[in-house]
Amino acid sequence: MQNQKIRIRLKAFDYRLIDQSAAEIVDTAKRTGAVVKGPVPLPTRIERFDILRSPHVNKTSRDQLEIRTHLRLMDIVDPTEKTVDALMKLDLPAGVDVEIKLQ
């Protein structure tokens, strides 16, 4: 797998889970002899919603809710076969979405 790189993009609502998962991936890749660039924190996407408090009247009384989506990006340069096998066997928390691309 010479001159290849693996790009990993992590997405989660909880920043602690995503940082823990990124640290596990970095440790696994370094243990197998690959070079890791990152994790790079990408901008947090914030979705805001306005919801009426009352079911009948009081249009001016509203609750504001938000969902924050945290993103991390990392590249594994010159991965070995051990690196790919170790990454496939890695057990990450359920709240973390992982996208892996080979380039």
UniProtKB/Swiss-Prot annotation:
Q: Which Gene3D superfamilies match?
A: Ribosomal protein S10 domain
Q: Name one GO cellular component term.
A: ribosome
Q: Which SUPFAM superfamilies match?
A: Ribosomal protein S10
Q: Which PROSITE patterns match?
A: RIBOSOMAL_S10
Q: Which key words are in the record?
A: Ribonucleoprotein, Ribosomal protein
InterPro entries tied to this protein = Ribosomal_uS10, Ribosomal_uS10_CS, Ribosomal_uS10_dom, Ribosomal_uS10_dom_sf
GO biological process: any one? translation
Spell out the molecular function terms from Gene Ontology: structural constituent of ribosome; tRNA binding
Q: Which NCBIfam families match?
A: PRK00596.1, rpsJ_bact
**Which PANTHER family does the entry mention?**
30S RIBOSOMAL PROTEIN S10 FAMILY MEMBER (PTHR11700)
Describe its assembly: Part of the 30S ribosomal subunit.
Q: What does this protein do?
A: Involved in the binding of tRNA to the ribosomes.
For this chain, the family text in UniProt reads: Belongs to the universal ribosomal protein uS10 family.
Protein's recorded name = Small ribosomal subunit protein uS10
Q: Which organism is it from?
A: Polynucleobacter asymbioticus (strain DSM 18221 / CIP 109841 / QLW-P1DMWA-1) (Polynucleobacter necessarius subsp. asymbioticus)
